[in-house]
Amino acid sequence: MQASADSTRMECLWSNWKCQAIDLLYWRDIKQTGIVFGSVLLMLFSLIQFSVVSVMAYLALAALSATISFRIYKSVLQAVQKTDEGHPFKSYLDMEISLSQEQIQKYTDCLQVYTNSIAKELRRLFLVQDLVDSLKFAVLMWLLTYVGALFNGLTLLIMAVVSMFSLPVVYDKYQAQIDQYLGLVRTNMNTIMTKIQAKIPGTKQKE
């Protein structure tokens, strides 16, 4: 019964985090999104200048400086006012953050499903189960060689973060026009791939 309650609570938390992520990406709260966006970019730009270990150490020191200073401030304030409010972070210290065995098993099963799905798809592409799909994958890998030559992984990550916080807003504002152009591109690509597939011996057109 307890495991079921924990699972329900975890699902509610996951749903809540999902809604919060959507609100962040769509800039529903400009101040909150700005803080998160700026913090992530600052951390990524810091990684350009410093190693991961240094950045993590600096972040830990900054967090400790804030919490220790606040703890000392509250202790002095309680001593001056002669009050006993207890530990300032007591509510966070008492918060349950452990995962039950059922929750761990659930997330492990989800990870296993995704891993198996990716492995099967890669096997299908590399062993040329469908020639056209394998050719598409080869073209994608060929394009990525040029992308990798122009940008390093960290630069691509920064571009991905900027896109995550900008593209949803742009799409939400110009959804009709973007859907129209994407439909045209998809139609043209399907037409081209159908012509190519028709000229390749031994391939069958997908229904």
Swiss-Prot record:
Coiled coil regions, renumbered to chain: none
One biological process term in Gene Ontology: brain development
Compartmental location: Endoplasmic reticulum membrane; Nucleus
Recorded superkingdom: Eukaryota
UniProt topology in membrane: Multi-pass membrane protein
GO cellular component: endoplasmic reticulum membrane; neuron projection; nucleus; postsynaptic density
InterPro entries linked: Reticulon (IPR003388), RTN1-4 (IPR046964)
Residue stretches spanning the membrane: 35-55, 139-159
Main location: endoplasmic reticulum
Tissues in which the UniProt entry reports expression: Expressed in the animal hemisphere (presumptive neural ectoderm) of blastula and gastrula stage embryos, and along the anterior neural border, in the panplacodal primordium, and in the dorsolateral side of archenteron roof of late neurula embryos. At the tailbud stage, expression localizes to the central nervous system, including the spinal cord, prosencephalon, mesencephalon and rhombencephalon, as well as the lateral line placode, otic vesicle and pronephros.
Ranges for domain Reticulon: 21-207
Keywords: Endoplasmic reticulum, Membrane, Nucleus, Transmembrane, Transmembrane helix
Classification via PROSITE patterns: RETICULON
Additional record remark: This sequence corresponds to isoform C of rtn1-B.
Stated role: Inhibits amyloid precursor protein processing, probably by blocking BACE1 activity.
Protein name (database record): Reticulon-1-A
Organism, as annotated: Xenopus laevis
Lineage: Eukaryota, Metazoa, Chordata, Craniata, Vertebrata
Gene transcribed to yield this protein: rtn1-a
